[in-house]
Amino acid sequence: HYAVFGGSPFINQALNPAATLRENIIDTVLNPMSSVYLYASQLVFADNALNVNAERIFFALGNDRKRYTEIEDALGVKKTGNLAKQIKTLTDHEILSRSIPINKPNDNKKATYELSDNLLRFYYTFVYKNTSALQVLGAEAFYDEFIAPALTDFIARCFEDICREYFSLQVRSGQMNGV
């Protein structure tokens, strides 16, 4: 559940602990009347500082555009530096995270961006770009068609991040060597 919904108490209170992941996704993220759906779809608009292009940036990230130039191309913006400021604002608010390859720490062109919030990452990967299909198909058929085939890969990314963090903590605390 964490890979999809994250750790927010607000979101986790809306989940049914007895339900499967599929059932919770259908009842919350795919239900336009649920507080979880409203949270994911309206978060950007709650803070005007984040509003400018944020939704379009999230959409680009949800479509596997991870590098700055890929985001820039997806948005079709001119190279004025405004996008860099917007990404910095989203990174400062911890909505986006920036990763730099360990072997190229000073190469900004190799940096990638991702949505930090698992729920937003899920929403912009599967739901946002397919909202009309959700309305036509209904939640269950939408899940089976758009989410189920890719869910394992989506969850794997979060699992890899958790494993990396675990080993990093083990090495820093001196409990593990040679990693």
Which residues does each predicted region cover?
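A short helix-loop-helix "switch/interaction" segment in the helical subdomain of ASCE P-loop NTPases
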Residues: H1-N12
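Accessory nucleic acid-recognition modules appended to NTPase machines
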Residues: I11, L15-P17, E23-V179
